[in-house]
Amino acid sequence: MREFSQIRETTETKIKLSLQLDEGKNVSVQTGVGFFDHMLTLFARHGRFGLQVEAEGDVFVDAHHTVEDVGIVLGNCLKEALQNKEGINRYGSAYVPMDESLGFVAIDISGRSYIVFQGELTNPKLGDFDTELTEEFFRAVAHAANITLHARILYGSNTHHKIEALFKAFGRALREAVERNAHITGVNSTKGML
């Protein structure tokens, strides 16, 4: 089974995270940031991943360090769980509607970290979650995992729906990218490595 666990502790946060790419039944998320817990749960459910997250952070300041550090650890676990990347699709993309909103995510498990994030989030806060942290989370994942990630909110009016569409699209796109493909021998690159 492709899986990896990591504990990362700093003066600001303590993150314990386990990711299972091939087993999506066990999902448990506790970060101390309710909206973020909801989004991570949606990501795992729609990507059919197993995900267990326990996070303690300086949320008395704000949720920034917790959200960013969870993204770093998730990216690290993804990179390690993929091992040598042999036989995977490598690319994945998904459009996901959430009522009036439409989100799009495209992923390349390229070994090169890059992110493009486009979207207007008009409501600055949802519960104790600063909505600008959405981009920070995706940036942290992309850099830690060494993947190229494009995330775009095409349209919508409800900020919750916009972010939810992105997290669901992220799960579905990542599922497609990490899926093993019997038609691919070795790594899916003319270079012979990713």
UniProtKB/Swiss-Prot annotation:
It is found in: Cytoplasm. Its EC number is 4.2.1.19. GO terms for molecular function: imidazoleglycerol-phosphate dehydratase activity. It catalyses: D-erythro-1-(imidazol-4-yl)glycerol 3-phosphate = 3-(imidazol-4-yl)-2-oxopropyl phosphate + H2O. GO terms for cellular component: cytoplasm. Keywords: Amino-acid biosynthesis, Cytoplasm, Histidine biosynthesis, Lyase. It is an enzyme of class 4 (lyase). InterPro entries: IGPD_sf, ImidazoleglycerolP_deHydtase, ImidazoleglycerP_deHydtase_CS, Ribosomal_Su5_D2-typ_SF. It comes from the Bacteria. GO terms for biological process: L-histidine biosynthetic process. It holds the Pfam family IGPD. Gene3D superfamilies: Imidazole glycerol phosphate dehydratase, domain 1. Pathway: Amino-acid biosynthesis; L-histidine biosynthesis; L-histidine from 5-phospho-alpha-D-ribose 1-diphosphate: step 6/9. Belongs to the imidazoleglycerol-phosphate dehydratase family. PANTHER family: IMIDAZOLEGLYCEROL-PHOSPHATE DEHYDRATASE, IMIDAZOLEGLYCEROL-PHOSPHATE DEHYDRATASE HIS7. This is Imidazoleglycerol-phosphate dehydratase. It comes from Bacillus cereus (strain ZK / E33L).
